[in-house]
Structures are given as structure tokens and as C-alpha cells.
């Protein structure tokens, strides 16, 4: 498999895993403090250094349940294999009987590597929606920040060792089953054509050997028959010579 293709496949596979896990996380997140809300009403208010951070709680047992569900694993495996198929990364896996085995290996890889700790390590600074409302005239709000951590979580997932182990395992699985993809597609076709010609040449050699064999057998039988005829003719010639000699006397 080419280097650029492998990197692209690795990146895409990581993104698929991160997206799938993040979707499951959203189903298992609950707010601890509710939505942060700051309201400024009236005239002439000066607000400095406003920071908003929403603390959320992640139900790890919920995540564990969703991630370990057969449907989640199967769907994630299907997304990954379909993505690889679309890239024509594993060309021959869609033409041989090993396709089922490859999908099984990918699913097992996901089961082994995607643990709850992967989620726990990436939600420590998660923030959700923050609201700052300012009404009135002459109000000044300075140095107001609203923290957004969803991108941080996504980056954490993509950079985690477990996610990397998963994508590495999947990449190795693809390499294992698609042994022809280490070559250029046209080289693969050339190899196939070469194999056909080799088979033709082998068949031609066999035919030549058979023909030579027939010729040898025919020559042997013909020579033997001729020799027998000569042996039968020799007494007749001798007898005729003797008769002619007797008459002349």
C-alpha cells in the first residue's frame, strides 16, 4: 500500500471513530450546573473579565453500554470498511472470500481498543452552551470569554493511544487481507496477464511433449514393423538364389 494512501486511510478511519464515539458521548452527558447565563440590564454598566464555563457530567456506564453494543460496533465497522472501499484501498478484499474474515477482525479490534477510559480522559474540560445577554445603553463588556470544548474533545479522541491502536490495527488488517494493494493496480493486472501466459506456455510445452512422444512411438513401431518384413523377406531371397544356381548347372 502506498504511503500517502495509508496516511489518508489512517486519518479518515480516526475521524470516523472519533465522530462515532462523540455521538455516543452526547447521549450520555448531563449538565451539573445547568446552562451558564449572565444578564446585564440597565444603563452604564461596566463588566470586566467575564468567564463562562459549563461543567458537565458524563455517565461512564452509559458510554460503556453504548460503545459495547453490537449495533454500535457493527455500524462503526461498516463505516470504516465502506470508507476504505470508496478509496479503493483494499481492492482485492471485495473480490475474495476473505471479506467476511476482515470485517470480523475489524469489529474485534474495535471491541478490544475502545474502552470507557478513552472517553473519560477526553471530557475533563468539556463545556456546552454559554449565554451572555446585554440590554440597555452605554454598557461596556470587556474581556468576555466563552469556553467551547467540543473541538478539544475531538482532538483528544483523535490523538489518543487507544484510537491510534484501533486505527493501526484496522490498517494492518486491511494490509493483511489485501495483499495485492502493495502494488500498482496496473501491475496487478500485468501479473494476472503474465500468469495466464505462463499457464499457456506450460500447456504448450505439455502439448509439444505429447506430440514428440507420439512421433517417437510411431517411429519405433514403424521401424520394428519394417525390420520384421526384412527378416521375412531374407529366406525367400536366399531360396530363389539357390534355385537359380541349380538350374544353371
UniProtKB/Swiss-Prot annotation:
Keywords: Capsid inner membrane protein, Host membrane, Lipoprotein, Membrane, Myristate, Signal-anchor, Transmembrane, Transmembrane helix, Virion. The keyword Transmembrane helix applies. Pfam families: L1R_F9L. One of its GO terms (cellular component) is host cell membrane. It is a single-pass type II membrane protein. It is found in: Host membrane; Virion membrane. A lipid is attached at residue 2 (N-myristoyl glycine). Residues 221-249 are extracellular. The chain crosses the membrane at residues 200-220. Interacts with A151R. Essential for viral fusion with host endosomal membrane and core release. Belongs to the asfivirus E248R family. This is Inner membrane protein pE248R. It comes from African swine fever virus (isolate Pig/Kenya/KEN-50/1950) (ASFV).
Amino acid at each position: 500500500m502506498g504511503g500517502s494512501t495509508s496516511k489518508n486511510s489512517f486519518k479518515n478511519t480516526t475521524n470516523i471513530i472519533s465522530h462515532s464515539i462523540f455521538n455516543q458521548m452526547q447521549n450520555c452527558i448531563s449538565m451539573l450546573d445547568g446552562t451558564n447565563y449572565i444578564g446585564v440590564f440597565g444603563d452604564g454598566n461596566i463588566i470586566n473579565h467575564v468567564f463562562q464555563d459549563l461543567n458537565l457530567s458524563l455517565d461512564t456506564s452509559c458510554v460503556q453500554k453504548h460503545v459495547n453494543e453490537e449495533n454500535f460496533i457493527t455500524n462503526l465497522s461498516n463505516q470504516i470498511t465502506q470508507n476504505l472501499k470508496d478509496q479503493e484501498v483494499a481492492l482485492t478484499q471485495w473480490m475474495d472470500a476473505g471479506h467476511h474474515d476482515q470485517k470480523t477482525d475489524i469489529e474485534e479490534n474495535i471491541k478490544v481498543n475502545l474502552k470507557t477510559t478513552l472517553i473519560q480522559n477526553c471530557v475533563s474540560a468539556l463545556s456546552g452552551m454559554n449565554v451572555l445577554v446585554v440590554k440597555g445603553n452605554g454598557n461596556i463588556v470587556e474581556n468576555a470569554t466563552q469556553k467551547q470544548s467540543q473541538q478539544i474533545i475531538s482532538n483528544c479522541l483523535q490523538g489518543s493511544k487507544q484510537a491510534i491502536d484501533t486505527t493501526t490495527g484496522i490498517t494492518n488488517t486491511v494490509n493483511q487481507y489485501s495483499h495485492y494493494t502493495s502494488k500498482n493496480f496496473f501491475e496487478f493486472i500485468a501479473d494476472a496477464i503474465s500468469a495466464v501466459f505462463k499457464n499457456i506456455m506450460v500447456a504448450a510445452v505439455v502439448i509439444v511433449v505429447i506430440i514428440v512422444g507420439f512421433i517417437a512411438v510411431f517411429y519405433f513401431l514403424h521401424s520394428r514393423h519394417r525390420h520384421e518384413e526384412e527378416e521375412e523377406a531374407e529366406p525367400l531371397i536366399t531360396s530363389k538364389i539357390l534355385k537359380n544356381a541349380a538350374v544353371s548347372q
